[in-house]
């Protein structure tokens, strides 16, 4: 494996973790917005859309977390 590819692989978990943290912050804000919208406009299209966005963001957050775990296992197995 060439050195630039190896370096990129080692940087990837950090980049994914940073993305996960950013997504976590945005997710918190979106969850607060969803709570507000769902209380104020219980059955509106806007509340439903917000609920869907929160669900998709939660799923993305879980997938990023799983990707970090898998990548770290790969790096530890391959390069130690």
Q: Predicted segments — roles?
A:
Residues 1-80:
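Long, low-complexity or tandemly repetitive, helically biased scaffold regions used
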